[in-house]
Amino acid sequence: MIQANNISKSYNNELVIEKFNIDINKKDFISITGESGKGKTTILNMLGLLEPPDSGEVIVEGKVNLNRKETMMVQRKKFGYLFQNYALIENETVEANLNIALIYRKGVNKKSLMKEALHFVNLNNSFLGKKIYQLSGGEQQRVAIARLFLKEADYIFADEPTGNLDMKNRDIVFGLIQKLNEMGKAVVYVTHDIELAERANQWIKL
């Protein structure tokens, strides 16, 4: 479980988030919506330990006030992230990008696992040799999801993961995110798309 207790955040002396509270359990599917500037991404970043709150606390599976080393360990082992801009290395191959999720996994057939991940996102094995910049936006986000599949994270934080996609690819990508949730992973996602927000089992409106 992840617990946020009265977390607050200010930028340039302007309060953006005040005393926000939430409990996130495994298998939760939580959406966050709100107007620009309401702090949606700020909340996501604090929950995902990408930035600390100014006050309050984020408790990760019973541990509070994690130091830098502990935070990095949690991010590596338990957390996964999806971003609107895909966060892939554009001049590297799909294989190289997927391998990032397998760096710490020893004694496994990495190529076989990569093929399994591509199958999960409905891309064929020929994509392993393609450069990221050769792919469409929808294909890039599917590669990012394949990397999450390989990482085996318990909690996924997604910031506008379908924001740059057309309707067809939006539905494909969001369907894959739902499949990750069905595998037992908690998903917290920011979206401007009300239709997608309504598919959550908990909808936070800022």
Label for each model-derived stretch:
Residues 65-80, 182:
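ABC ATPase NBD coupling module
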Residues 156-159:
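Catalytic Walker B motif of ABC-type/P-loop ATPase nucleotide-binding domains
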Residues 145:
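Hydrophobic anchor residue at the start of the ABC signature
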Residues 109-126:
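Conserved ABC ATPase "signature" region
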